[in-house]
């Protein structure tokens, strides 16, 4: 995949590590931290604001952390206030809602939907088309 740097929007408050590749048409919102050696493919949204963004004029985006050596594949949306450990990876078209926490070396398959307020430990692997409801244990 070529990285053409077309239509990439990165908030001035985002922190981007070394050797990070960001695909075309990707948005990185406020308070996102992307550690070293991360690849974010085309058409992704990282740090998607929470619903109060649309009604609270004093809204501040909570932090979102993408750990080093992670890969976020195309058309994935990751909401704010989530944390992903080292070596995290997604398939294509993954949605991960707010308040999600994933440990090291976790994988989420293509077209999966994580509805937020969840926590996964290290080395978890969710295959394609998985739906995890909010606050699942």
Could you tell me what each predicted segment is?
Residues 51-61:
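Intrinsically disordered, low-complexity Ser/Thr- and acidic-rich flexible linkers and loops
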Residues 1-2:
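Basic/polar N-terminal segments that are highly enriched at the extreme N-terminus
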Residues 5-6, 11-12, 17-18, 23-24, ...:
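Left-handed beta-helix
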């Amino acid at each position: 995949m070529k990285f053409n740097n077309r239509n990439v929007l990165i908030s001035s408050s985002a922190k981007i590590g070394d050797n990070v590749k960001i695909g075309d048409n990707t948005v990185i919102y406020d308070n996102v931290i992307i550690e070293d050696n991360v690849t974010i493919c085309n058409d992704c949204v990282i740090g998607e604001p929470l619903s109060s963004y649309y009604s609270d004029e004093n809204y501040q985006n909570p932090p979102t952390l993408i750990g080093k050596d992670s890969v976020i594949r195309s058309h994935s949306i990751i909401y704010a206030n989530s944390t992903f450990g080292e070596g995290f990876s997604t398939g294509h078209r993954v949605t991960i809602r707010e308040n999600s926490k994933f440990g090291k070396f976790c994988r989420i398959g293509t077209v999966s939907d994580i509805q937020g307020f969840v926590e996964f430990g290290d080395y978890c692997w969710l295959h394609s088309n998985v739906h995890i409801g909010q606050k699942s244990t």
